[in-house]
Structures are given as C-alpha cells and as structure tokens.
C-alpha cells in the first residue's frame, strides 16, 4: 500500500468536501456496528429484521459457535446462538431466502456445507442429510480453493454460488456455479480467473444493478493494511468479467485498517457496504476484526465510486427500538484498574463499539458509574468483550457510594450473550459492575459498553411462536424467538401422552434450572412457546390445582406474566389434571 498516495487522497477529499472525520475513539461513533470481534460479514434483511452472519474472531483462528446478530433498527443488535453446525470452525457464513420459502445457510471450513430451515435463524439441517455432508468440496472447480461461499439470486430466481481464496497464483481464481432447483447440485460451473478479477485473493460478492453484474472481492493480506476491496463487471453472472479498480482500502491515519471481506445491503435506492476492519489499537496479526458499514455511491456510467470509510457509519435505518435514555452515556466513571491508556474506564460509557475498558488483572475487577444524582434504574445492558462466551458478574447500586444493594447477581451465570440484560427497579446514583469469573481462563472482564436505562429495555422485541402438536412429531429443534435466542429441544417423556420442552444446555445455571417443562395428559392441541422466562395460561397465571410452583413465581413487566426460574409441572391428582387440561391452553413468552 502506498502511504503517500493514501495521505494525498485524504487531503484532497478534505479539501473538496470539507468533511472532518470523527476520530475512532469519539463518543457515539456508528462504526463498528457490533460490540465484539467478528469478520466476513453477510448482512440480510428478512421482513422487518436485519440479520448479520459473521465469523467469530478474536481467538486467533476464527474459532467460535454458530451465531447471528439481529436488529430492527440497524443500531441495536442482539447476539443469537444457532443450532448448526456443531463445529466451531465456521467461517464466512451466508444465508439466502429461496423462492420455495426456505432459507439456505452456507458455511465454510475449507469446504462448503449447506443447511436449510424455515426461518433465517434455524433450526438448520444439512440439506444433504448427514450433518457433515459437503456440498462443495475443496477444488470442486479446478484451481479454485474452496472458502468464502457467497450466493447471488438473479432476477429470474436463479441462484449462483461463488467461492475462493488464495486466488493469486497463476491459473487460479474464484469458483462459480449455478445451483440446480433442488439446491443440492450445480447445472453449470466455471473458474473466474485472476486475469479477469485482477489481484483476486478471496471473499467474492456478486450483486446486480441496472443490468450490470458487479463481481467484488478482497485482495492483499487480511492480516495487515494491504487488505482491500476491488471489483469487476459483466453483463452475465458467470462472466467473463472486466476489471474496474479498487473501491475500499486502509485510510490515511490507519484507524480503518485492512478493510475488506464485505457484503452489500440494498435499502430502497441506497446501497451499503458492510465490511470488517482491524481493531484499535491494532491487535497482533489482525485476528481481532470488527464490523463496519458505509454508504456506496455510483457514477452515471454505473461504475462504483471509491468508498471513503468512516467512523460515523450510517446510523439507524428504522426507528430506534430503545426508547429510554442511556443514563450512563458520558457519566463519570472509575475502575479498579485499566490496562493502559488505550483501554480507559471512560470507554465503557461512550456508546462506542470500537473502544473498550480492559482491566489490568484477571481477578475481581470492577467499574463504577456515577450518574451525578440518584435516578430510577430499571434496565442495565452489559456488552462484554466476547459475546459468544459467558461471563460471571455482580451488579450493585448505591445512593451514597457507601452502602450497596444487589441489582443483579450473575456470579453463577452460564449464559453467553450480548448484550447481557438485567432488570430491576431501584433509585440510585452509583452503579458498580464486578467481574467474578468467565468461561475461559485468561479472558478478563473487559467491557465495550455499560448502558443504564431508566425504563424497561429488552434487547429484542417480544415475539410469539405457535407450536401445534403436529409440529413436534419427529422434530428435534424449535427456535426461541425471544430476547435470549437459542433453541429448544423437543422430546417425548416417559408417559405416552406427555410432552417435555427443555431449554438448551447453555441455559443451565448452577443456581437455577433455566427451563420450561410442561407435562399434560392427554397431549394439548396447541402450545405456544417463545422462551423460558415467563408464562401465562389463558392470559393469567394458573393458581388452581397447584399447577405451578407458586413459591417460585414472581411478577414482572408486563402485568399478568410471571417468571418461571425453575422447571414447572402440573401437580395434582389425575382427575384434576385431565379436567384442567381439557379447558386450558398453555402459553409461554420470553421478554
């Protein structure tokens, strides 16, 4: 990369536009989009929800569980686990919706697997049957190394798949194929050589605009500043393509470093490029990447203008789902320690997903927020450094900074997520978060953002999911569409007409058994399930026949919904159960 050329370009841009770039550590920057280390993003909008599929980064080798981030406004994102694949070697995922109504999930670990589901979050099953069955083995197309699979759906509904890495060698390039209607085979394949896609290294992405097919890809090394996005065009999805140039590269001051492996979101007439870049300060070897987004522009002839990467991002694409004020934003803060000047305590309250408070030690480090005056607090979001790992912590509040009360005790937590959401209702001036342990040794309690709200702010909207008796016959998974995501396992219990719905293993906790177990006989005609946290029967809590463990129930918002922090079951004699079952309908909802 020619640094002089970058500086000159930056100066010319500033002179021409008067644009002042916000520094990477400014409060409230829009980039990165998500708090955490993720790479190789694919962004899609299905219905009114945005989905971000990405490689889990930060481990040194792109190692992490299957997951997806969801958002209604493109600003507030919630991490949701997915059921497949079981391996943690999951790179460059992509999901598309087919004309058959199903969703197809393409994931890579030096070969491409394909899952199918009725929803964009799964539950997924390998389209070829066996969980480890491979759709595209390595070198399926000669001289195309299999990695980074991405789909493109043409106007006529035809589906194409593109893949490749290390395409810089002579005679190498990108593999491309047109999928058959069953999505299990190809009707046509081709190598798009690096003589057409100059400098092609990896991460192909194809889109169509006004009759032009754009073949975009990444060049250089993903470990350093040379990583960039280039493109070529054609009048056919399989090419041949004509090289057009570079459209995204490292900025002049290096704070947007190694941008690449992108996807494109079309929203109305606007196009947005979502890409990863290295963290700030830069970690060793570029394995701590973060996701960003910037607006694309096109010239009259259809060529893509050079994209100027920013720390501002694009902001919200819909009305914000968060209605309450973040009391912690810009508040005074102090901590037990901080690693160095690049990881100050103030970074935990700046609403910036690219700045991090990191304590010096690995023990019970703490951070304390001073709101100035006592205020009502109902919700606290904590966005820890690694959203796919669980953290154990204690949140306390105080009016005077001397006498403390417990707001949330998660010292036995086994649930991963981002944000971690804790509810309560207290008036306090001080909030203290203490890290007490975590999933992996050597990972301290670093925090991207600590957000304190005066209202009730769930990180995802309440959603209902109908489940009839027929749905669980022969079925193993049912998604949790509520705030905490994940999936339920469905299984028959010992009694022939009973049904058990158990939460997945990541909801287990030493202190509480986070699950819903419903046993009715005979089997109910229908049951509505969304989550594992609250329940109601016919719009009210069932209090007759000792249906639930009453001593374990507590009321939460909204009214008439009750938390079920342990397994619940029907209790009483057989006649009571039978009479009860015939006239009642069970509902569970996650807030």
What are these regions (language model features)?
Residues 1-21:
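Bacterial Sec-dependent N-terminal signal peptides
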Residues 21-198, 208-254, 269-270, 276-320, ...:
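Beta-rich carbohydrate-recognition and catalytic domains
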Residues 38-40, 90-92, 146-149, 201-204, ...:
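Conserved positions at the start
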Residues 170-182, 318-351, 461-497:
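Predominantly extracellular/luminal regions of secreted and cell-surface proteins
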Residues 197-198, 311-330, 363, 508, ...:
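Surface beta-strand/loop "capping" patches
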Residues 263-265:
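Catalytic nucleophile loop of clan PA
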Residues 350-462, 494-591:
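Aromatic, loop-rich ligand-recognition surfaces of beta-strand-rich domains
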């Amino acid at each position: 990369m020619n640094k002089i050329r970058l500086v000159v370009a930056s100066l010319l841009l500033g002179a021409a536009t008067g644009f002042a770039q916000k520094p990477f550590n400014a409060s409230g920057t829009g980039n990165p989009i998500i708090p955490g280390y993720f790479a190789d993003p694919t962004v899609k909008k299905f219905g009114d929800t945005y989905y971000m599929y990405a490689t889990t980064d930060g481990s040194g080798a792109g190692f992490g569980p299957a997951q997806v981030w969801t958002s209604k406004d493109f600003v507030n994102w919630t991490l949701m686990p997915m059921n497949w694949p079981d391996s943690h070697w999951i790179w460059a995922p992509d999901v598309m919706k087919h004309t058959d109504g199903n969703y197809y999930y393409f994931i890579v670990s030096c070969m491409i697997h394909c899952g199918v589901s009725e929803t964009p979050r799964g539950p997924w099953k390998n389209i070829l049957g066996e969980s480890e069955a491979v759709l595209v083995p390595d070198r399926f197309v000669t001289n195309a190394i299999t990695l980074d699979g991405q789909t493109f759906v043409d106007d006529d509904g035809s589906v194409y798949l593109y893949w490749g890495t290390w395409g810089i060698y002579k005679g190498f390039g990108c593999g491309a194929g047109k999928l058959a209607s069953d999505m299990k085979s190809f009707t046509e394949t081709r190598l798009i050589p690096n003589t057409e896609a100059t400098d092609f290294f990896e991460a192909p992405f194809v889109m169509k605009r006004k009759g032009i097919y754009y073949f975009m890809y990444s060049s250089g090394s993903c470990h350093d500043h040379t990583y960039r996005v280039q493109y070529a065009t054609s009048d056919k999805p399989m090419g041949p393509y004509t090289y057009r140039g570079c459209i995204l590269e490292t900025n002049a001051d290096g704070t947007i470093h190694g941008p690449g492996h992108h996807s494109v979101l079309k929203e109305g007439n606007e196009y947005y490029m979502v890409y990863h870049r290295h963290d700030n300060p830069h970690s060793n070897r570029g394995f701590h990447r973060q996701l960003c987004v910037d607006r694309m522009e096109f010239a009259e002839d259809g060529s893509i203008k050079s994209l100027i990467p920013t720390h501002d991002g694009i902001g919200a694409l819909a009305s914000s789902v968060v209605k309450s004020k973040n009391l912690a934003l810009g508040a005074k803060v102090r901590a037990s320690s901080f690693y160095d000047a690049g990881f100050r305590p103030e970074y935990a309250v700046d609403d910036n997903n690219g700045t991090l408070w990191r304590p010096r030690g690995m023990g019970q480090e703490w951070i304390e927020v001073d709101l100035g005056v006592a205020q009502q607090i109902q919700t606290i979001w904590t966005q820890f450094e690694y959203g796919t790992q669980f953290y154990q912590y204690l949140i306390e509040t105080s009016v005077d900074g001397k006498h403390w009360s417990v707001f949330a005790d998660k010292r036995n937590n086994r649930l991963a997520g981002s944000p971690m959401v804790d509810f309560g209702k207290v008036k306090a001036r001080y909030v203290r978060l203490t890290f007490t342990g975590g999933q992996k040794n050597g990972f301290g309690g670093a925090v991207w953002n600590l957000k304190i709200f005066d209202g009730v702010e769930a990180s995802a909207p309440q959603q209902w999911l109908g489940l009839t008796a027929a749905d669980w016959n022969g079925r193993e998974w049912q998604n949790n569409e509520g705030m905490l995501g994940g999936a339920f396992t469905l299984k028959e219990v010992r009694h022939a007409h009973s049904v058990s719905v158990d939460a997945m293993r990541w909801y287990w906790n030493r202190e509480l058994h986070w699950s819903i177990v419903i046993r009715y006989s005979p089997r109910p005609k229908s049951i509505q399930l969304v989550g594992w946290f609250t329940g109601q029967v016919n719009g009210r809590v069932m209090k007759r026949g000792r249906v639930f463990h009453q001593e374990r129930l507590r009321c939460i918002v909204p009214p008439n919904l009750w938390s079920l922090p342990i397994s619940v079951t029907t209790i009483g004699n057989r006649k009571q159960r039978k009479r009860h079952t015939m006239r009642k309908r069970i509902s569970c909802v996650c807030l």
